[in-house]
């Protein structure tokens, strides 16, 4: 029997708004709140890729570049860029969008590694991602060394 390929390698895009309850005394978004949004997007991307449930096992090379403020829209993009037999590496980037311009300014990026599991919480095999472009090869290498 032939191994099934990935169901989708298209990115997942999540939009969220920074509300007062998501900010600190300086009205900037809590880093933990942003990490939660990014983790959720990574999980959706992994599930879209393999049609499986996933759990996060590590977050690597996460860099906070600039703050997001109360009222900003956060656009988070997650894409599977690396696989091993049971694990996906998802590159996640978050941008802040001001309401006046709706132009993205990167605020954070990193790699989220997730393991596919069955109903008993045991790891299961997944389809493999095969980089085809130079950009995909570069992201594969970055994820592998993260």
What are these regions (language model features)?
Residues 21-36:
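A conserved, well-ordered hydrophobic junction motif at loop->secondary-structure transitions
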Residues 2, 8-14, 69-70, 81-146:
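HotDog/MaoC-like acyl-thioester-processing domains
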Residues 3-7, 17-25, 53-61:
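Short N-terminal helix-initiation segments at or just after the protein's N-terminus
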Residues 18-19, 64, 114-116:
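Hydrophobic residues in beta-strands and at strand termini
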Residues 16-17, 39:
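Amphipathic, well-packed alpha-helical segments that form the structural scaffold of globular domains
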Residues 9, 29, 40-77, 81-83, ...:
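Hydrophobic beta-strand-centered segment that forms part of the acyl-chain substrate-binding groove
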Residues 35, 39-40, 129:
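Ubiquitous "structural anchor" signal
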């Amino acid at each position: 029997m032939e191994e099934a390929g990935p169901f989708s390698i298209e990115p997942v895009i999540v939009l969220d708004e920074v509300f007062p309850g998501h900010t600190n005394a300086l009205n900037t978004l809590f880093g933990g709140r942003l990490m939660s949004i990014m983790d959720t997007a990574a999980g959706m991307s992994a599930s879209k890729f393999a049609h499986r449930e996933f759990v996060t096992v590590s977050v690597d090379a996460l860099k906070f570049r600039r703050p997001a403020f109360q009222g900003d829209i956060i656009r988070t993009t997650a894409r599977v860029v690396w696989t091993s037999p049971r694990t996906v590496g998802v590159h996640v980037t978050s941008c802040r969008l001001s309401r006046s311009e709706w132009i993205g300014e990167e605020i954070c990026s990193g790699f989220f590694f997730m393991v596919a599991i069955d109903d008993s919480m045991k790891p299961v095999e997944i389809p493999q991602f095969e980089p085809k472009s130079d950009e995909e090869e570069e992201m594969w290498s970055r994820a592998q060394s993260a």
